[in-house]
A protein has these predicted regions:
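Catalytic phosphate/metal-binding cores of nucleic-acid and nucleotide-processing enzymes, i.e., regions
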Residues: 1-96
Length: 96
């Protein structure tokens, strides 16, 4: 199973401070993991420090995907997660 440590993060463009990663799994579901803050220093994602993450469940392919709001995992994005909690959710997504 894929874990947080296997995610590859990239910086946001357009003056957003933070990073993002996306991974699509073999079952057609995936995960988006982000953390960002505004230029004035306030966190804009569902995080409150640099050790928390926000995730969304994805459905699709690497080229074309959408946020999926209809899984048993969540019907929204989930914030304030540790790396370990992100890994736990990644494993659940891979088992869908």
């Amino acid at each position: 199973m894929k874990t947080f440590k296997e995610l590859e993060f990239n910086k946001f463009k357009h003056n957003i401070i933070g990073c993002k990663s996306k991974m699509i799994f073999e079952n057609g579901y995936g995960i988006s993991v982000v953390r960002f803050k505004s230029k004035c220093g306030f966190f804009s994602s569902y995080t409150s420090n640099e050790s928390e993450w926000e995730i969304a469940v994805l459905k699709g392919t690497k080229e074309k995907w959408d946020i999926c709001y209809t899984t048993e995992i969540t019907d929204d994005v989930i914030g304030h997660l540790s790396e370990e909690e992100v890994t736990d959710i990644m494993i659940k997504i891979q088992k869908l």
